[in-house]
Amino acid sequence: MSFVIRPAGMEDLQHLYEMAKLTGGGFTNLPPDRNSLTGKLEGSQTAFARRGDEIVGETFVLVLENTETQVVRGTCQVFTAVGHRWPFYSYRINRLTQYSKELDRTVSAELLSLVNDLEGTSEVGGLFLHPGERAGGLGMLLARSRYLFIAAHRHRFGERILAELRGIIDERGGSPFWDAIGGKFFGMSFQEADEFNAIHGNQFIADLMPKHPVYIAMLDEEARKVIGLPHPSGRAAMRMLENEGFSYQGYVDIFDGGPTMLADTDKVRSIACAHHGEVDEDTLEKGEKALIAAGEFEDFRCCYGARDIRGDAIAIDAQSAELLGVGTGDRVWSIAR
């Protein structure tokens, strides 16, 4: 079987909706709501069609297609700048140290502060691979294709990139973190708040969430111990992000307390090490395993293949050339697998 990453279109709505129903809670970028998904696809098509260098709040939706069956089996998203349409809120973990001369005692406490520090940062997110395809490195293909897309359209993205990892969700679909903070102010369960946010944005957080810092020590133990931890299903994703140069810098999601990972865009490994060159006239039979991408905007494609870098040129295998629709002299991006 062969797979290719390509821009999503309205014809992919049903496949995306079926996958959205498989995600479980805490996956706001792929809500199981047809109207929301339709709006996301329409916005993505507008972003792909726009030309220009200015950075605005856009979302590019990509899908993983089985080219033999034409069935979509995964998806991922790239956001040019968060916080344009709706405020982008995070909790930042701070430390406050105080000293009492009378008691001769120093007390240090950790606080959760509601902040907009990350507004304007680009984001990679929305990655979901159908459970039936979780073998053969397709999750890695989805994840790293986003970086080659950014490399190919660097002028449309910011100086930093973030990635939010889903936090700990219990067996009932609830969030200990939400129950300890947000749930006390909104009268909503975690799933209700999560679904509302996915469809309507998080302005309601700005309207009702307390603005004063929250002392972590005052939260119950169940909430404290999940702060900054990814959901077990996201641990591999966290390792992949760390391998790309992302790090956890004390920002957590306001809903489930999951970690927000950050990196300088030009230092992300798959961007910094990406090779850009013209396709050589020789067809490669064997070579270095790689991710190879070609095309701009709505013509973007990415797949696994083989390459041989020859200075400014690159030889690639015949199957990749066919999947990407490239020939001699066309330019491609690639990164070692």
Regions found by a protein language model. Give the residues of each.
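Short amphipathic alpha-helix that is part of the acyltransferase structural core
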Residues: 1-90, 218
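A generic structural signal for residues embedded in beta-strands
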Residues: 332-334
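Anionic-ligand-binding alpha/beta catalytic cores of soluble enzymes and soluble regulatory domains
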Residues: 215-283
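Conserved acyl-donor/pantetheine-binding loop and adjacent beta-alpha core of acyl/acetyltransferases
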Residues: 80-126, 191-199, 205, 209
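Conserved GNAT acetyl-CoA-binding A-motif
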Residues: 118-127, 147-166, 176, 225-228
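Conserved acetyl-CoA-binding loop-helix of GNAT-fold acetyltransferases
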Residues: 107, 111, 126-129, 134-150
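Short beta-strand-centered segments at strand-helix junctions
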Residues: 305-329
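Long, charge-rich alpha-helical interaction segments
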Residues: 181, 190-208, 214-225
